[in-house]
Amino acid sequence: MTALTQMKCEACQADAPKVTDEELAELIRMIPDWGVQVRDGIMQLERVYKFKNFKLAMAFTNKLAELAEEEFHHPGILTEWGKVTVTWWSHSIKGLHKNDFIMAAKTDLLLD
């Protein structure tokens, strides 16, 4: 499979299929620092990034905002002192789409 970071998000309509259990098992191995959470019955990807201070956390948040705009796919972001919690899911299908895994992998690249 092509590296997730090399892929582009595709338009996700309300009738787009959610990832299957088999796809989930394969894709989650490609982003090992991410976990799967279920909130209000909606499966989501989540990761907490740690930083030395609020300024670094905010700089990461701003880079993530730019990436989200470029890909037209937007996460939940909670920025706090020393950490940023990022949550990816596809709002239109109320669950996980391949786009969410692509964006999780690209989010990890922002640390470099």
From Swiss-Prot:
CDD domains: PCD_DCoH_subfamily_a (cd00913). InterPro entries: PCD_sf, Pterin-4-alpha-carb_dehyd, Pterin_deHydtase. GO terms for biological process: tetrahydrobiopterin biosynthetic process. Pfam families: Pterin_4a (PF01329). Coiled coil: none annotated. It catalyses: (4aS,6R)-4a-hydroxy-L-erythro-5,6,7,8-tetrahydrobiopterin = (6R)-L-erythro-6,7-dihydrobiopterin + H2O. GO terms for molecular function: 4-alpha-hydroxytetrahydrobiopterin dehydratase activity. Keywords: Lyase. Its EC number is 4.2.1.96. It comes from the Bacteria. NCBIfam families: PRK00823.1-1. Belongs to the pterin-4-alpha-carbinolamine dehydratase family. PANTHER family: PTERIN-4-ALPHA-CARBINOLAMINE DEHYDRATASE-RELATED. This is Putative pterin-4-alpha-carbinolamine dehydratase. It comes from Shewanella oneidensis (strain ATCC 700550 / JCM 31522 / CIP 106686 / LMG 19005 / NCIMB 14063 / MR-1).
